[in-house]
């Protein structure tokens, strides 16, 4: 077993970041247990905890995965270099956001372990509850074994509980990655331009991915029902107007509004 550490910038609201992950877990792949984020990679296991006294993430890696690659992925997933001072100072000006920032200073968008995995999870979650999306992801894992483009293309996804168009969108996404049509190492604007031409990647989906994959600090899915509910507005237009003073950090504002435990 390998045990490593990752230094993080304070403030680092581990409990709230863990809550975000717990609410969106992929069954059989991830779990949150007693303050630890656990991820399985085939037969291997990664566990992450946070030591508040030293401001370090403690990472346990068992199996044959490369520890350096795991540490890099965790660092990106949790954006450990995020400097909260400027962002939180701006968002505290909002009466709506001020109490949320006070309760979880340093909250930032959670990234992704795998761009493909998050893309699939986002398509699956369209127009369904978080609980329903979790159930569908469980079925996908059961059918595919491992959520990679190769396994998704080869899997039988018939009668999995999703509309046929959504299943085809997932398959098209997998094929585009295998063909090299999508390259997540390219600048996000280039990636977004490709996604825009593909089925299943409308404005909401692309804005959400811009937050979590593109690290666009001002991306904002203004049609999101959860954001409208948290902001106490009824329409996307009202939400856009309300969010205007939050620029250029609307993605962080969205993250505070999405947090279910604030």
List the model feature ranges, each with a label.
Residues 1-262:
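HhH-family (HhH-GPD) DNA N-glycosylase catalytic core used in base-excision repair
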């Amino acid at each position: 077993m390998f045990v490593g550490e990752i230094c993080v910038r304070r403030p680092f609201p581990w409990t709230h970041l863990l809550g975000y992950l717990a609410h969106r877990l992929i069954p059989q792949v991830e779990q949150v247990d007693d303050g630890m984020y656990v991820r399985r990679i085939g037969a291997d296991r990664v566990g992450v905890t946070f030591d508040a006294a030293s401001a370090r993430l403690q990472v346990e890696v068992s199996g044959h995965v490369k520890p350096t690659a795991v540490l890099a992925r965790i660092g990106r997933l949790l954006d450990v270099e995020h400097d909260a001072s400027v962002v939180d100072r701006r968002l505290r000006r909002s009466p709506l956001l001020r109490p949320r920032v006070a309760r979880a200073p340093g909250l930032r968008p959670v990234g992704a372990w795998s761009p493909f995995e998050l893309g699939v999870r986002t398509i699956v979650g369209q127009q369904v509850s978080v609980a329903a999306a979790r159930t569908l992801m469980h079925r996908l894992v059961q059918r595919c074994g491992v959520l990679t483009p190769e396994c998704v293309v080869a899997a039988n996804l018939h009668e999995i509980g999703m509309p046929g168009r959504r299943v085809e969108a997932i398959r098209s996404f997998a094929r585009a990655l295998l063909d090299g049509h999508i390259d997540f190492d390219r600048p996000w604007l280039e990636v977004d331009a490709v996604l825009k031409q593909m089925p299943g990647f409308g404005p909401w989906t692309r804005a959400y991915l811009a937050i979590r994959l593109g690290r666009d600090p001002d991306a904002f899915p203004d049609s999101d029902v959860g954001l409208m509910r948290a902001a106490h507005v009824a329409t996307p237009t009202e939400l856009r107007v309300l969010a205007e003073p939050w620029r250029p950090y609307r993605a962080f504002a969205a993250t505070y509004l999405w947090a279910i435990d604030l």
